[in-house]
């Protein structure tokens, strides 16, 4: 699963992740940033 085109987040089913470039990365739920 890649990044969703309309925002910076990944598919919700993949858990707390966000986009970094074209890849999904883990999202730090404490500071809401990509790790």
From Swiss-Prot:
One GO CC term on file: host cell presynaptic membrane
A matching Pfam family: Toxin_7
Record organism: Allagelena opulenta
Site feature Critical for insecticidal activity, where: 9, 28, 33
Disulfide bonds: 3-19, 10-24, 18-34
Compartment(s): Secreted
Keyword Ion transport assigned: no
Name this protein carries in UniProt: U2-agatoxin-Aop1a
Annotated keywords: Amidation, Calcium channel impairing toxin, Disulfide bond, Ion channel impairing toxin, Knottin, Neurotoxin, Presynaptic neurotoxin, Secreted, Toxin, Voltage-gated calcium channel impairing toxin
